[in-house]
């Protein structure tokens, strides 16, 4: 760059900083905040699939899937992990279905959890915005987008048509929220439900509720599905679960994680440690026997899981080694993911029209 252009650029940057404040514009190489803070999800394989060891702080995350697929369980596990790190969490329960006893079993400190059960979608999103702007809340869960009913719909009659109201509400709220969330370094997770598009002959007929705005604003989108049942004899004791990272702005996307959710316990950490340990050759498997550091830890996976549950020091050591092995190749910097962010950024009018066209 020639000297005249450099002077012009320096003058422009100085004017911008004078008018909008220091740090309003900067060279990407100048900032020291390229590393993205993250909160573990409670699933080691999902942390690895996300590429940065968990869900990113200062971002919007969408978790969607069919009924009883583990959406709320996964978010409660995130809350439990955040509370272990001393963070403050809030749960906006628009579905009015939060079970505090189940949350406690998953490790959530229920007494410290902020809970709101709003009457309307506007109230829920306003509460969320106020919590974010306070700068004192680190994790906010909205359960769920489908339950964020606009005030006009609640006050109207049952058969009234309210086309596009929820999509317009989400689009307006996210425009306000996204900057505040980044400034407050708060993780905001929206749980969403699946609907079917009518008359789709080709392609995937599934879509999420609330229009398209959330798809654009979310840095991470997770598709969670129940893939099978876990049985103890004839009794079903849990679900085999698969999570696909369908969008990721902080690491390469399209990875997936498989783990077990046990009823009344949550995500089975020991099962993941054994599967990943064998894959990475930290745990030796010979026939039905599993061994760690030359010592046999159990015959059959169930016994090996029992050993790790009783010997937490060994489990923590294996987890630490796995994180070092599997996350060291994915440095948590946004520079590495430039090719991933290829989508266009629509104007407000375009975003509203997109949201309205997809509302159901």
Swiss-Prot record:
Leader sequence segment: none
Residues where ATP binds: 65-72
Domain of life: Bacteria
This protein's GO CC annotations: cytosol
Pfam family, one: RecA
Biological-process GO terms, alphabetical: DNA recombination; DNA repair; SOS response
Keywords, sorted A to Z: ATP-binding, Cytoplasm, DNA damage, DNA recombination, DNA repair, DNA-binding, Nucleotide-binding, SOS response
Gene3D superfamilies: P-loop containing nucleotide triphosphate hydrolases
PROSITE patterns: RECA_1, RECA_2, RECA_3
Record localization: Cytoplasm
Single GO MF annotation: ATP-dependent DNA damage sensor activity
Biological role: Can catalyze the hydrolysis of ATP in the presence of single-stranded DNA, the ATP-dependent uptake of single-stranded DNA by duplex DNA, and the ATP-dependent hybridization of homologous single-stranded DNAs. It interacts with LexA causing its activation and leading to its autocatalytic cleavage.
HAMAP family in the record: RecA
Family membership noted in the UniProt record: Belongs to the RecA family.
Stated name of the protein: Protein RecA
Provenance organism: Tolumonas auensis (strain DSM 9187 / NBRC 110442 / TA 4)
Gene designation: recA
